[in-house]
Structures are given as C-alpha cells and as structure tokens.
Amino acid sequence: MIRRSTIVGVILATVISAKAGIDLTPSVNDYVSEGIRYQKLIFHDDKRSVEYNPPANWTYAGSAGQLRLSPPKKSFAEATIEAMSLDKPQPLDQTLVKAVEQRLIAELPPGSQFAKVEQELENSVPVNGGPSFELIISYQAMGEKLVKSLVMANVRDTQLMFRLTARKDDFEALHRDFKASIFSLHWVEPSEGHSGIAKEAQQPAAR
C-alpha cells in the first residue's frame, strides 16, 4: 500500500513556491473548421489572454485555479489543468522533477497499490513553444488498473500542470487526445483583433 508522504507539503512550499496565476474560468468561442464544430476556451492572464482547444466532445468546468475535463463515456477518466504564478524562474531540473514525482504518488487515492513510474519524458509536448517534462505512473485502485500522467511546464512566470487519469485500456487514446490539446495552448498579447474575439467568447457555454 502507498503511504502519503508527510514531506510533500514541505516540498510544495519550498520547491514549487507560487501564488495564484492564470484565471482558468473559461470564456468560450465556437467555430467551424472543415465542416467540424470546435470550441476554443479563452482564459485571462492579467492583460493577456490564453487560448486552448480542448479535445473534441470532452466536457469541462473551470474555476480560477483549475480546469477539469472529462471524456465522453469513460469511467475513471478525468483530466485537469492547473496554473500557478511563479515568484521567480524555476528550471525543470531533477530537484523539481523528483519533488513533483513524490507529489503525484502522494495524490493517488487511499489504498492504491503497485505504484510504478513507467516513463519520464523530456519535451514530450511543447507548451507555448517551450520545454516540458512528463511523468507517467501506473497503479491499482478500486479494483482497476489505472494510469496517471502529468505534463509540467514553466512558461514565462507561470507553472502549468496537465494531469490525466484513466483506465489502462483507455489511457493511450485519451492521452493522445489530451496531449494534442496541450499543444494548442498559447498566450495572446493584447490587440484589437484578439480583443474582439474575447468579447464574443464571453457567452456561457451550452452544456
């Protein structure tokens, strides 16, 4: 059985020193490309906007600190995006990676067993054109074989964490779709052209 580490809180306080960052409450812009309807989510980072295309047909709900996404008809599957504003630049070095690895294992459900780090990948998906690091962990919980991934990136003064959890049999396809959506995330500087888009996107999403 996995024991939750009592040092995780210290790690997060010292290694991942951060404060509230991007507001992940989404505005929504619907558009059609090649006959297919898509949704673009627009977040706010001070005067800049951040644009993100979620995987097709995934539902979502956002708050200031977190965006949650769920694929259709998949039990035990969920993705989240978190953004924190960094007090100072933090390189993606082994100290940070090991701290996040401990955090990821500590976050597993109580009673989880057989946790194993399956992969550690550098730059598996660029985030806003910059470097990233990915951890993939397998484990068993609630009678299911599950896989959890975390993609971490420091972009400008923001630390981003993209998590995905799914059954082992569902993970590969969902992981591919989620990483493709991560690739779409990018910052947009203030301009008249983009401010028009942002105004249109203030309409609430039809759920």
Which residues are covered by each model-predicted region?
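N-terminal "mature-domain start" segment
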Residues: 25-65
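Bacterial N-terminal signal peptides that target proteins for export
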Residues: 1-7
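Surface-exposed amphipathic alpha-helical segments
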Residues: 58, 158-207
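Conserved polar/disulfide-associated segments of primarily extracytoplasmic proteins
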Residues: 22, 60-154, 160-161
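Hydrophobic h-region of N-terminal signal peptides that target proteins for export
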Residues: 11-20
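Compositionally biased, proline/threonine/alanine/serine-rich low-complexity intrinsically disordered stretches
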Residues: 21-41, 77, 86-91, 98, ...
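Solvent-exposed, polar/charged alpha-helical surfaces in well-ordered, non-transmembrane soluble domains
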Residues: 52, 56, 98, 102, ...
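Soluble non-cytosolic domains of exported or imported proteins
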Residues: 45-49, 90-99, 168-179
